[in-house]
């Protein structure tokens, strides 16, 4: 696996993006709200900074992890993802709609996981 998609830019989605980016994976994070995406990237940057300050992560690795995260509002961004992790709000109707819109954009061999 090289590319991971994350649906939802809340606490869980940003955490998943953080861990995957530090692990060396390219991350595509999608949310319906640009503001949520901006907050998520700022949170990841803050948390990576804390890891760096504590000596848990080199500064070069922090910058590299941040560079691996891209954001957007269109599910088409997941077209080349090997795995897409759904971390949207805990509402069954929302989740059904997410999957309905997501599936047409995925490769036939892509995996889908839900949080």
Where do the model's predicted regions map?
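NAD(P)+-binding Rossmann beta1-loop-alpha1 motif at the extreme N-terminus of oxidoreductases
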Residues: 1-50, 54
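Rossmann-like NAD(P)-binding element
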Residues: 35-36, 50-112
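Structural motif
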Residues: 7, 15, 30, 72, ...
């Amino acid at each position: 696996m090289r590319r991971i998609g994350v649906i939802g830019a809340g606490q869980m989605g940003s955490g998943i993006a953080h861990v995957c980016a530090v692990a060396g994976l390219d991350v595509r994070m999608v949310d319906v709200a640009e503001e949520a995406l901006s907050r998520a990237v700022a949170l990841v940057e803050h948390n990576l900074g804390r890891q760096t300050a504590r000596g848990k992560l080199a500064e070069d690795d922090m910058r590299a992890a941040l560079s691996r995260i891209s954001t957007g509002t269109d599910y088409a961004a997941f077209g080349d993802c090997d795995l897409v992790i759904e971390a949207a709000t805990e509402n069954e109707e929302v989740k059904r709609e997410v999957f309905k819109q997501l599936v047409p954009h995925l490769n036939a061999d892509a995996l889908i996981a839900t949080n």
